Amino acid sequence: MKQFLSLFLMMMAFQTASSQNIQLHYDFGRNLYPDEEATRQKVTATLEQYKADDWGSWYYFVDLDLSRKETLGAYTEISREFNVSKKLPLAVHVEYDGGLGSRTGSYQQAALAGIAYNGYTPTFSSTWSVQLLYKRFFKSYDFNTAYNSLQLTGVWGVHFFNHKMSFSGFVDFWRGQKANGHGQLVILSEPQLWYNITNHFSIGSEVEISNNFIYNTVNDKSFFVNPTLGVKWNF
């Protein structure tokens, strides 16, 4: 859930800026696709933090997928950016993605490195980032292999109605790999819309839109739209 990053790219203009939030989402995916997503989580808890410093910024999030009886999985992305120049909105971006599932073992881990172009409007009401990254998937269990990939990422955040509403999200495009070793384009986007009741508490929704991302053994369907209903607390 990289949405949080877009809302705090503006902090790169200041030193030692930091912010953190926690989100709780009820997921309707299993209701919409009872066969294809029969094992999908109902609830996801997310912790995110962004911190800017003299060299650039740190960012991470942790997703916990929950059921009534257990934690189904934990997934994290942690990234570091090093500013190229104070006069240029460019940064060197390095990242690690991975996690563990209680039923499936580890997620396929990946390391990423590349360049990021970050920007914001003069009033800081809109922020954006475009990243072009080399991506290396590692062999995580018996049924997959290590391979090289390329990822293009866009991240955005917009405040409007006097900061009462926030629209943020990301979209990723990368080369995935089928079981037969052939490549495929994977698309994943998670836009969020929040109504900010106070400076700390928000209610809203996230919609996970994907193609060739969800592992489906029931049929040949590859495109899914999974909405949530969520609450967020900004520390």
Predicted features and spans:
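Outer-membrane beta-barrel "beta-signal"
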Residues: F223-F235
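Bacterial Sec-dependent N-terminal signal peptides
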Residues: M1-N21
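Membrane-embedded beta-strands of outer-membrane beta-barrel proteins
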Residues: L47, T76-I78, A113-I115, L152-W156, ...
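Transmembrane beta-barrel strands of outer-membrane/channel proteins
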Residues: L24-F28, Y60-L64, V94-Y96, W128-Y134, ...
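Solvent-exposed loop/turn segments connecting transmembrane beta-strands
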Residues: T39-Q41, D65-A74, L100-Q109, F138-S149, ...
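Short glycine/proline- and aromatic-enriched beta-strand/turn motifs that initiate or cap beta-hairpins
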Residues: S18-S67
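Outer-membrane beta-barrel transmembrane domain signature
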Residues: K135-S202, E208-F213, W233-F235
